Swiss-Prot record:
Membrane topology: Multi-pass membrane protein
Organism: Homo sapiens (Human)
Subcellular location: Mitochondrion inner membrane
Solcar repeat residue intervals: 11-101, 105-185, 200-298
Protein name per UniProt: Solute carrier family 25 member 43
């Protein structure tokens, strides 16, 4: 749901760069909330106060301020390949779901987005697992020194398949995620009492946040089990910090419910929901600012600080067409005649 309408005035590389920079900044500024979410999902520390603020304060005092950003570098690094794979997969699925007349239903479009997200997650899954391991370790006594060292260590100690531990939950969790997306989308016109094509920018932002809250809440139990499976390792102190012992995904569900009740599957949801508005707010504003810079560079607007269009420029032209048109008129510009005596 967190997508922007394609602007033909940007090149493919510029769109990817804008999305990458926006994602990197939003991830970095909300990293402490992501840390609190993962810590609550993997293991509830007995005898300590719960909640995102208490968790962040405890990590800060024990490991220092820098520890609040554990795993964020890996999360940012995986953003670019993940976005590229997701975009390529989405285009393939759109072609697959498009009918003979070139139309695609809204349900098919949502399914294409969900499947593309699932493909990109599977392809880049080892980096997500490593991010979880880095978050769970104590940076004062680290088991892994970084992305490459973690990849090498896990591969040597636990085998290649350990890098994909819990990946099945990504596939299963896509079902409630897609259902939540469709549920929100089908009720948008009822919520705003108006057609979708007339929604304002604040309304679209609210739609994205609402969809994220619903879909993440529905799929959160699968995310919790996935995080526990990612973190669990006999080679790490305290089995990776996992608070229940299990032998597989189904057994993990069973042990969580047995030890903590059904609501234990939603441990960390508060921090996750608190992250939604600032995350998408930073992402949208950063993307729009980067987009303005690119539009100014391409010659469509007069300044990156405003959306004032350049007079005489056809906004329907693509960047390559606009460059060729400028080059054409530049070569056709008459040379000044020399004065004759």
């Amino acid at each position: 749901m967190a997508t922007w309408r394609r602007d033909g005035r940007l090149t493919g590389g510029q769109r990817l760069l804008c999305a990458g920079l926006a994602g990197t900044l939003s991830l970095s500024l909300t990293a402490p909330l992501e840390l609190a979410t993962v810590l609550a999902q993997v293991g509830v520390v007995r005898g300590h106060a719960r909640g995102p603020w208490a968790t962040g304060h405890r990590v800060w005092r024990a490991e220092g301020l820098r520890a609040l950003w554990k795993g964020n570098a890996v999360a940012c690094l995986r953003l670019f390949p993940c976005s590229a794979v997701q975009l390529a997969a989405y285009r393939k699925f759109v072609v697959l779901f498009t009918d003979d007349l070139g139309h695609i239903s809204q349900w098919s479009s949502i399914m294409a987005g969900s499947l593309a997200g699932m493909v990109s997650t599977i392809v880049t899954y080892p980096t997500d697992l490593i991010k979880t391991r880095l978050i769970m370790q104590n940076i004062l006594e680290p088991s892994y020194r970084g992305l490459l060292h973690a990849f090498s260590t896990i591969y040597q100690q636990e085998g290649f398949l350990a890098l994909y531990r819990g990946v099945s939950l990504t596939v299963v969790g896509a079902l409630p995620f897609s259902a939540g997306s469709l549920l929100v989308y089908m009720n948008l016109e009822k919520i705003w009492n108006g057609p979708r094509d007339q929604f304002s920018l604040p309304q679209n932002f609210a739609n994205v946040c609402l969809a994220a809250a619903v879909t993440q809440t529905l799929s959160f139990p699968f995310e919790t089990v996935k995080r526990k499976m990612q973190a669990q390792s006999p080679y790490l102190p305290h089995s990776g910090g996992v608070d229940v012992h299990f032998s597989g995904a189904v057994d993990c569900f069973r042990q969580i419910v047995k030890a903590q009740g059904v609501l234990g599957l939603w441990n960390g949801l508060t921090a996750n929901l608190l992250k939604i508005v600032p995350y998408f707010g930073i992402m949208f504003s950063t993307f729009e600012f980067c987009k303005r810079i690119c539009l100014y560079q391409n010659g469509y607007i007069l300044s990156p600080l405003s959306y004032k269009l350049t007079p005489g420029v056809d906004q329907s032209l693509q960047p390559q067409e606009l460059r060729e048109l400028k080059k054409f008129f530049k070569t056709r510009k008459p040379k000044p005649k020399k004065p004759t005596l």
